[in-house]
């Protein structure tokens, strides 16, 4: 009679307050192909809001898949709150993580918003009354508490993404990853989701990691990590990244030129002077 495989269920503790640490991480999709992630090292403290930016193919989305354990690097080390990520700890590690993807339509499986927010809680053996309280609290945090009995697919893009965020929040993760979470939304939807990200940042209760091309998200973050050809080529405060106009052009951001940056800021309610000098613009942004 074949032996049953014993399921490993490791409960992990926070060993330090470094939410995420990558050390010399390398990953390639196929043998003899160049590394999609090539010797990347960085650390993110708990409560920080960090953006990971770069053009398509730069390695930023590969990093997000490595963080959540979908991909395993060939070299290097990944730690979440001091716990090294490997096959025997990944189940425990994932309890620290929540992720919101680019297309909210791919995340709905229930017949109501309540069902979708509850997805993931069902395996946690939570009493029904407590589960409903968790669902309602998560929905209220993103302004969707009046939509709990609505059909998800009838919602707007911004509302769907808010439900996806509520679903992540219901699991009470310490780290939330937004993987291009605003890129498929209309301007109203983008504004709604970016405000939720800012609110989460201001609470400092969670670490926010956003894979993005969006200038507003970059400006709102505490730190920007810039990827190019699989390597981390710059890491610093947003204004440190934005000082270099040629650098912005080289990574093909959606709004790489100063005039477009000014327009983007004005559309989001920030009054800035006309200028073609990136340093002047960044200095002005940082004073506001």
From Swiss-Prot:
It is a peripheral membrane protein. This is Energy-coupling factor transporter ATP-binding protein EcfA1. InterPro entries: AAA+_ATPase, ABC_transporter-like_ATP-bd, ABC_transporter-like_CS, ABC_transpr_CbiO/EcfA_su, ECF_ABC_transporter_ATP-bd, EcfA_1, P-loop_NTPase. Its EC number is 7.-.-.-. It comes from the Bacteria. It comes from Spiroplasma kunkelii. ATP-binding (A) component of a common energy-coupling factor (ECF) ABC-transporter complex. Unlike classic ABC transporters this ECF transporter provides the energy necessary to transport a number of different substrates. Keywords: ATP-binding, Cell membrane, Membrane, Nucleotide-binding, Translocase, Transport. The keyword Cell wall biogenesis/degradation does not apply. Residues 20-254 form the ABC transporter domain. The gene is ecfA1.
